Amino acid sequence: VADIVKAGRVALDGIVLKKSDQKVEADQVTLDGQPLEAPHGLLAMLHKPLGYVCTHSDGEGPTIYELLPPQWMNRKPSVTSIGRLDKDTSGLLLITDLGPLVHRYTSPRAEVKKIYEVTVDHALEDSLIETFASGEVMLRGEDRPCLPAKLDITGSHTASLTLMEGRYHQVRRMFASQGWHVEKLHRRQFGDYQLGTLEVGRWQMLDTPEV
């Protein structure tokens, strides 16, 4: 916290704080221009870096919650991510303390658009576009096919994949089912929210929708 204050990222009523031990009201404080408190429910967008896990406590590495304001961990109910990205995936994560909002986006019946940027181990083939769009791709251990997905090939080894569902490690498993290994994975859109220019490791407050 002291390092964040020294870096000039914390302000009180628009005035940058100089001391980390200064006592102020949380709802008057901003970090990188964003308010730290949201009394009626919180929704934020985080640009998750590689190497971070989405659990509150995990021995595998640092958690995404270390990137958020410490007082958010004391909210009741506590903040959580809407869905998860694995340790080796970067990109957009939504953070909230609103249970109904989590349910809205993660319910098995929810068809939420998710767009991923993918890099694979060997050259992509145009036939993969039709395969993913067919709605017939089966994942190992599952008894129903994936919903149709839109694949845009952007380079010999790169593509953009749009999904309307969120199964466990779905992108990696879909490519693996067709003989490709995903070497790099980044989510740039979730629902109507896009990362835009949000820097890696930073968060941004969003307007809370009605739930």
What are these regions (language model features)?
Residues 98, 123, 164-168:
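Helix N-cap motif at beta-to-alpha junctions
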Residues 1, 13, 94, 118:
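Residue-level signal for inorganic ion chemistry
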Residues 15-20, 134, 140-211:
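RNA substrate-recognition surfaces in RNA-acting enzymes
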